[in-house]
Amino acid sequence: MSRRGTVEEKTAKSDPIYRNRLVNMLVNRILKHGKKSLAYQILYRAVKKIQQKTETNPLSVLRQAIRGVTPDIAVKARRVGGSTHQVPIEIGSTQGKALAIRWLLGAARKRPGRNMAFKLSSELVDAAKGSGDAIRKKEETHRMAEANRAFAHFR
């Protein structure tokens, strides 16, 4: 019998201004080279730009964007009998949110534009409306899972 204790599940802390865990998760993914204050600056500027563009609550736009990009299912490479199959697997809510945030930031970084705050705000507004690269990535993932549904029993 193992003597190790059970590990407490880590909960994401909330950010100082909005007291929101999603904002903190987003800041931690924006973060580069340990410059967290810069990551906070970028996100807060993006939130201000969202407020100016949409004239609605920017946190609801952020939630809507992440909800729209969060995948329900993904594909995982699985080697069976010498060939590799893309096996569709269901994704939990935490992992789905993490993927959504990663896709949103990747799409924002690829966008042409002046600075990261501008690009991030544009991507979040587009995702909330149901367009943009991050939404396309989610749809592509769902299409891949649907196409490989025959391999679902390999889980």
Swiss-Prot record:
Pfam family name, one: Ribosomal_S7
GO biological process: translation
SUPFAM superfamilies hit by this protein: Ribosomal protein S7
Keyword Chloroplast: yes
Molecular-function annotations in GO: rRNA binding; structural constituent of ribosome
CDD domains associated with the record: uS7_Chloroplast
Subcellular location: Plastid, Chloroplast
UniProt entry keywords in alphabetical sequence: Chloroplast, Plastid, Ribonucleoprotein, Ribosomal protein, RNA-binding, rRNA-binding
Chief subcellular location: plastid
Keyword Transmembrane: no
Record's GO cellular component terms: chloroplast; small ribosomal subunit
Family, as annotated: Belongs to the universal ribosomal protein uS7 family.
Assembly, per entry: Part of the 30S ribosomal subunit.
Protein task: One of the primary rRNA binding proteins, it binds directly to 16S rRNA where it nucleates assembly of the head domain of the 30S subunit.
Family annotation (NCBIfam families): rpsG_bact
Name of the molecule in the record: Small ribosomal subunit protein uS7c
Species per Swiss-Prot/TrEMBL record: Beta vulgaris (Sugar beet)
